[in-house]
Structure formats: C-alpha cells, structure tokens
Amino acid sequence: MSDTSTGYSDPNITPPMGEAVPLGLQHVLAMFASNVTPSVIVAGAAGLAFGGAEQVYLIQMAMLFAGIATLFQTIGVGPVGARLPIMQGTSFAFVGVLAGIAATQGLGVALTSCVIAGLIHFALGSVISSIRSWFPPLVTGLVILAIGLYLIP
C-alpha cells in the first residue's frame, strides 16, 4: 500500500494545524453523535419526554462516563488502558435489548441490567484470551449484522 495519497508514512507525524483542526473537529462531532443517539433511543423507548430532565440526565451521564473511559484508555491506570488516543463511549450493540427492557420493565430495570452486564463484562475481560476461539469472524459478523438490522425500523 502506498502512502502517496496522504504523504504521511509515520503514524507519529503531527499534521499541520490547518489539517489537524478540521480533522479533530470532525472526530469530536462523530464522537458526540455516537454518544448521544443511544441515550435518546433508550429514553424514547422508556417513554421519557423528548428534552425532558430524565433524558437530559441520561445524555449527560453517557457523555461523562465516555469522557472518564476515554481518559482511562488514553492515560492508563495500572493494567487498564491502551495508552493511546482511543475514544470510548456508548455502543449501539446494546440498544435493541435495552430499549426492549426499558419499554416493558422501565428505565430502572434497564439501567440495573447495564450495571450487571458491566460487571460480567469486566469479569470476562480477564479470561478473554482463552475464550477468543469461541468467537470466530462468522459469529461476530452475524452479531453485528443483527444489530444493524434491528436499527433499520
């Protein structure tokens, strides 16, 4: 692969300010949209008023914890974090299930399920290298396809 299109071959090169500012702004806007949208979808499924205090609170918490997780990823704390400029935030992977729980059981049950799933995810993180073979590309690809198909309507 040739790097003649960008002129950059070293990933440690800092682009000129005229390129860095628009690219950084684009990255921030993409991060903002991807962090806000799942909160809006889940709040709507829970029957919260658009722009109401509860929905605003969900969005604020999503942004706050995305910032904290990004700091953990960038700075690193002990063995946690890649120590690279990686943005962490909310995911669309859980939106279908969480919206269903919020619509039928309420927002409290939905958020409690997030805490329990987070603890399970944390526990699986220590053994992921030994169970990675259970998730071949076909399985992970089908999961991503199912997530995308759920978001169509």
Predicted regions and their residues:
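N-terminal signal-anchor module of multipass membrane proteins
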Residues: 1-85, 93-101
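Hydrophobic alpha-helical segments embedded in the membrane of multi-pass proteins
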Residues: 60-71, 90-95, 115-122, 142-147
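Membrane-embedded alpha-helical modules
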Residues: 101-153
